[in-house]
């Protein structure tokens, strides 16, 4: 049976009492629809945050996620939105090349091992 990392992330977010909308579809300026694993609502402290929790954290994931994000954020309504990627480091460290690529694009990366510590600060309203 295939396990989805996003399901494990959802369980951890629930245990941290972080509220989110799961499986959000957003149409980009290309007219393609892009799926995001989680949406964290805008608040007085944070902009709207879109979040991906990919099963793999590699070059292909970077390309897939960044195309969808670039297309999504070009909409003027989402100009101030941010992207967060939660990486699965439970069995192996996050791939350095993918980590660097996301950071070079201004994407916040949260390793799963740090999620319990960082979620209440960075993802809660």
Question: What is each model feature region?
Answer:
Residues 1, 7-11, 15, 59-125:
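Charged, structured surface patches that assemble and position nucleic-acid processing machinery
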Residues 10-30:
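A short acidic/basic microdomain associated with nuclease active sites
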Residues 32-35:
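A short, glycine/Asx- and small/polar-enriched loop/turn
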Residues 39-50:
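Active-site beta-strand-loop-beta-strand hairpin of nuclease catalytic cores
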Residues 53-58:
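Glycine-rich phosphate-binding "P-loop"
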């Amino acid at each position: 049976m295939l396990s989805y990392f996003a399901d494990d992330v959802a369980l951890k977010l629930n245990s941290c009492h972080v509220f989110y909308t799961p499986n959000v579809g957003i149409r980009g300026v290309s007219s393609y629809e892009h799926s995001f694993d989680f949406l964290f609502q805008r608040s007085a402290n944070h902009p709207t945050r879109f979040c991906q929790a990919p099963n793999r954290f590699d070059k292909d994931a970077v390309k897939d996620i960044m195309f969808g994000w670039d297309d999504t954020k070009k909409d003027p309504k989402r100009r101030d939105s941010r992207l967060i990627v939660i990486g699965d480091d439970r069995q192996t460290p996050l791939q350095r090349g993918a980590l660097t690529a996301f950071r070079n694009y201004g994407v916040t990366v949260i390793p799963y091992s740090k999620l319990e510590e960082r979620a209440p600060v960075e993802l809660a309203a």
